[in-house]
Amino acid sequence: MSANEDQEMELEALRSIYEGDESFRELSPVSFQYRIGENGDPKAFLIEISWTETYPQTPPILSMNAFFNNTISSAVKQSILAKLQEAVEANLGTAMTYTLFEYAKDNKEQFMENHNPINSATSISNIISIETPNTAPSSKKKDKKEQLSKAQKRKLADKTDHKGELPRGWNWVDVVKHLSKTGSKDDE
């Protein structure tokens, strides 16, 4: 079989195997993503496999550069890719996309044993908090809220409901009053 026929057969098999699986995503007929782990799992990661023109005789391109993997350190990513590359070399010449995804699912805990989540929000807040002491003493002025009297507060509370929203229909026009002002066509 030619490489193109092998790819078509594997593509058909992947579509039937992963039909309805939310973790699997077909980016193009030669590029696939699979999320290993659940959505909220801090040890979840995303693998992208792209086939070359001569795949499966040549190895596919493996990638973990997806935005989903931003919390994973580059050392852990390199470790995962190295282990997947070993599996690629063992399966060279055969359809291996499903095998690689399953291998990653089976070895997820081993792959992520050295994983310490990088929290980008924490690192940004650390940068901000480092810069804040320099600017904080110079701006001690606080913005004052508008002070309302009791009567103003009561009037505002009467207009709004318990959520602070205006009631439904507060700007509706009284139909009878409106029509009496405009008159009918017979009056002209």
Curated annotation (Swiss-Prot):
Residue numbers spanned by region Disordered: 132-167
Disulfide cysteine pairs (residue numbers): none
Pfam families for this protein: RWD
N-acetylserine carried by residues: S2
Segments of skewed composition (Basic and acidic residues): 155-166
Coiled-coil residue windows: none
Acetylation listed as a keyword: yes
InterPro entries for this protein: RWD_dom, RWDD4, UBQ-conjugating_enzyme/RWD
Residues in RWD domain copies: 9-111
Highest rank taxon of the organism: Eukaryota
UniProt KW keywords: Acetylation
SUPFAM superfamilies, per the entry: UBC-like (SSF54495)
Protein name, entry field: RWD domain-containing protein 4
Biological source species: Homo sapiens
Lineage, opening ranks: Eukaryota, Metazoa, Chordata, Craniata, Vertebrata
Gene: RWDD4
